């Protein structure tokens, strides 16, 4: 039943012509040099059967990050994968892997595309499926785990569980008067230099 779907694959390689400062620094005397190539590489594969079933994988490497060597022996710096199904009996949607969650007009959480204030005062209500598959190369604004939405008549129930590591600045207290703490979360997704990789 799901064999006659549509396959799509995207491979994109881009590079800024000018060499960034991180490539020009002497690696023997500094730690903030970029050990990887200046190319940014994106790979995306997706299979979609109607609007009922899809799966896909995304791999992304930022400029300056290593590729299949050094800190990145597994290839891309970021991987994302998902399996997503809709309309299976009372199961309205089932997400396995990476997905987004959209609740409460964004007051609770809203990870899909959403517009804010505009001249159109009537268009203030956000509408989207509660669970959606994640196809992007962004490394922070999604959930990784399992989610399910059950629907019967006018009732709808959504349950999801998610666990993923995120980048953060960890500050160790040297005076022993305080506990170690996290000073900030990193949303850039860069892992080029030694300090970025340690975050």
Language model: regions and residue ranges:
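Active-site metal-binding loops of divalent metal-dependent hydrolases
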Residues: 99
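Signature for the C-terminal beta-barrel architecture of outer-membrane proteins
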Residues: 4-6, 12-40, 46-48, 52-81, ...
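Helix-hairpin-helix
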Residues: 1
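Surface-exposed extracellular loop regions of Gram-negative outer-membrane beta-barrel proteins
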Residues: 102-119, 123
């Amino acid at each position: 039943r799901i064999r006659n779907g549509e396959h799509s694959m995207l491979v994109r390689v881009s590079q800024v012509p000018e060499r960034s400062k991180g490539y020009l620094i002497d690696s023997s005397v500094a730690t903030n040099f970029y050990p990887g190539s200046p190319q940014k590489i994106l790979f995306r594969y997706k299979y979609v059967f109607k609007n009922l079933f899809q799966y896909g994988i995304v791999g992304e490497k930022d400029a300056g990050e290593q590729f299949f060597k050094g800190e990145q022996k597994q290839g891309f710096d970021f991987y994302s994968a998902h399996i997503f199904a809709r309309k299976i009996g009372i199961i309205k949607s089932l997400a396995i892997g990476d997905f987004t969650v959209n609740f409460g007009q964004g007051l609770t959480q809203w990870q899909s595309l959403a517009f804010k204030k505009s001249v159109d005062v009537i268009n203030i209500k956000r509408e989207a499926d509660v669970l959606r598959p994640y196809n992007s190369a962004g490394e922070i604004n999604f959930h990784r785990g399992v989610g399910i939405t059950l629907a019967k008549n006018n009732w709808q129930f959504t349950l999801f569980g998610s666990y993923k590591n995120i980048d953060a600045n960890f500050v160790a207290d040297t005076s022993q008067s305080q506990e170690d703490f996290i000073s900030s979360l990193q949303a850039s997704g860069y892992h080029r230099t030694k300090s970025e990789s340690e975050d």
